Amino acid sequence: MTQTADAASTALTSGDAASRNIPKIGFVSLGCPKALTDSELILTQLRAEGYDTSKSFAGADLVIVNTCGFIDDAVKESLDTIGEALAENGRVIVTGCLGAKAGEGGGNLVRQMHPSVLAVTGPHATQEVMDAVHVHVPKPHDPFVDLVPAYGVKLTPRHYAYLKISEGCNHRCSFCIIPSMRGDLVSRPIGDVLNEARALFESGVKELLVISQDTSAYGVDVKYRTGFWDGKPVKTRMTDLVERLGELAEPFGAWVRLHYVYPYPHVDEILPMMAGGRVLPYLDVPFQHAHPDVLKRMKRPANGEKNLERLQRWREACPQIVVRSTFIAGFPGETEAEFEHLLDFMREARIDRAGCFAYSPVEGASANALAGALPEAVREERRARFMAVAEAVSAEKLRERVGAEMQVLIDAAPALGKKGGRGRSYADAPEIDGVVHLLPPQKASKQLRVGEFTRARIVGTQGHDLVGQPL
């Protein structure tokens, strides 16, 4: 995911900024939704202090690049973006996961590759970034600067937003270096989370996407301590948080969608909330593999057989539930039999939405020391075979929806939908899942507006997507 300050320009434009000599900051956000929320915090602070944003590197007094350093492609994209910003502007501050990554000899990788950057920080370092900005572009003094809205500055479209509930992770998966960059789990105070959620709903957000490194573990680090919100006690615990978010969303007719949910036993407690319509019947669960030996080498906290049992329980409790997951093919030591076991799991589990990565060694990951590294061609071939099975399952599930009526959140609607539009059902998270292609309404009076809901009858499928007739 790549976002620039353009996405926030309507919230940040100062009108006659040039005439008042307000400094402008260029901004690029790379990586996952968790990095996006870090970017939003920085942009919110910039706005609070009176800075404006620039739509180009050349037009900025300084550029901030929020980087990703998880896989090699992300590292390359981040380094290339830093280089581009340096070439066009020359004054660059780097933050994010790549900023915490070591290079040769243990030195900072960003400093080694781009020694002229002004400052480098790791992830979730808003204050450090602002301190660096103040050094190189002093804070403007303007008593007439607009106040920042309660929900902060967002890089997403106005009708959906990400809500980060914690930072870091207590797991030590052998293929992952996130804990070394973002640290152990730190849960946000539940009152702060709920206040942010309420402000987002009040601002017009119709879909709230709950994110973290491990949503199921929310509150573990503080022993599920009791917090207070609206004068009432509430535990810092995933199930309590989800229940309150559902209550907040209901009067606004908004959706709550859960991401990065590890399949712990207490996840079963939120299924009745899904079945009752309090939160979306959608779970993003990172299974990664199904064979117990591979999961053991990955140091994952589950096994395939238990996951099949969980999926069966979830579907019994909430038949309409949609499960999304990600998997890794070609992990070191993975035999053909272990990979076939994974394919059998996919066929039996019937995961609605599945993505798969060919294993890619990440510098600093303990998996690099495992025996049995597979050639790239084998890894890619297994990824392709996995996706063929996953796409067949997905296509079958999509066909089952033809003839059904679904609620669709509209993401695009040229000419108020007179030529059709595009939206998503409860089964579709933004950017990672499919969409619903909306046909032109049959009623002349029917209008489609971005950020609003419409009912649609599903009339067909198109690849990973559905085709719907607005009602």
Curated annotation (Swiss-Prot):
InterPro entries: Elp3/MiaA/NifB-like_rSAM, Methylthiotransferase, Methylthiotransferase_CS, Methylthiotransferase_N, Methylthiotransferase_N_sf, NA-bd_OB-fold, Ribosomal_uS12_MeSTrfase_RimO, rSAM. Disulfide bonds: none annotated. It catalyses: L-aspartate(89)-[ribosomal protein uS12]-hydrogen + (sulfur carrier)-SH + AH2 + 2 S-adenosyl-L-methionine = 3-methylsulfanyl-L-aspartate(89)-[ribosomal protein uS12]-hydrogen + (sulfur carrier)-H + 5'-deoxyadenosine + L-methionine + A + S-adenosyl-L-homocysteine + 2 H(+). Residues 399-471 form the TRAM domain. Residues 155-396 form the Radical SAM core domain. HAMAP family: MTTase_RimO. Catalyzes the methylthiolation of an aspartic acid residue of ribosomal protein uS12. This is Ribosomal protein uS12 methylthiotransferase RimO. Keywords: 4Fe-4S, Cytoplasm, Iron, Iron-sulfur, Metal-binding, S-adenosyl-L-methionine, Transferase. It is found in: Cytoplasm. One of its GO terms (cellular component) is cytosol. One of its GO terms (molecular function) is aspartic acid methylthiotransferase activity. [4Fe-4S] cluster 2 binds at residues 169, 173, 176. It comes from the Bacteria. It comes from Methylibium petroleiphilum (strain ATCC BAA-1232 / LMG 22953 / PM1). It is an enzyme of class 2 (transferase). GO terms for biological process: tRNA modification. Residues 23-138 form the MTTase N-terminal domain. [4Fe-4S] cluster 1 binds at residues 32, 68, 97. Belongs to the methylthiotransferase family. RimO subfamily. Its EC number is 2.8.4.4. Its main location: cytoplasm. Binds 2 [4Fe-4S] clusters. One cluster is coordinated with 3 cysteines and an exchangeable S-adenosyl-L-methionine. Its cofactor is [4Fe-4S] cluster.
